[in-house]
Curated annotation (Swiss-Prot):
SUPFAM superfamilies: Aldolase. One of its GO terms (molecular function) is 3-deoxy-8-phosphooctulonate synthase activity. It comes from Haemophilus influenzae (strain PittGG). GO terms for cellular component: cytoplasm. This is 2-dehydro-3-deoxyphosphooctonate aldolase.
Amino acid sequence: MQNKIVKIGNIDVANDKPFVLFGGMNVLESRDMAMQVCEAYVKVTEKLGVPYVFKASFDKANRSSIHSYRGPGMEEGLKIFQELKDTFGVKIITDVHEIYQCQPVADVVDIIQLPAFLARQTDLVEAMAKTGAVINVKKPQFLSPSQMGNIVEKIEECGNDKIILCDRGTNFGYDNLIVDMLGFSVMKKASKGNPVIFDVTHSLQCRDPFGAASSGRRAQVTELARSGLAVGIAGLFLEAHPNPNQAKCDGPSALPLSALEGFVSQMKAIDDLVKSFPELDTSI
């Protein structure tokens, strides 16, 4: 199976290319924090030679509680994204939840993301595809890796073949997620070689019974990320925060920003090693 390359400016995203770090914060909390977080990622990735795309949401439309912080909204969020691009020269990925958001968001950012909970909503998928933007499809927690091929087909039928697939964990009973490491190769096969990336942060989520917000397993972020990159994938999705315990969304799963360089250094070493190996055919 030939690995497809999705280009984001001068960045090649492919399962056999050096991994791309899609990193940032869960949701835009303020303009100043976005600048701080983006600058930290840029410094680390430039130092280590890791391709980088900034990530954040302008609206977390699927929060469990109506009282939870959602973000600054599309208009203000796009202004912040544009300033990040102008200041740091970064590529940006963000998610959309409504059809009317697709084109305005695609006009500013470089990748638009199809949220896991909405990945089978055909009208939204079609609207995203018709923008011509690169699309990152989050695998729903309730969907098997092999079913991702159907979502890819919807996008391709609209004339867009710039597709990245992302695993963010699978439901394991109630209120818990696990990651099936065999699922990455299944998604590669289902999409006929599209890039597959791993959202390690959201895969660490778990819930307290009757709670209004997700808990998380931040202490295990390194071992889970190592495992994912050891499979041989196109990229890693990561959220970091200056003070995870004070984050407005998913702080229990976020990497402390102070640990970013050490973390990325380890991930690069693993990715370099794994992709230095010749591919073995064990299917005989």
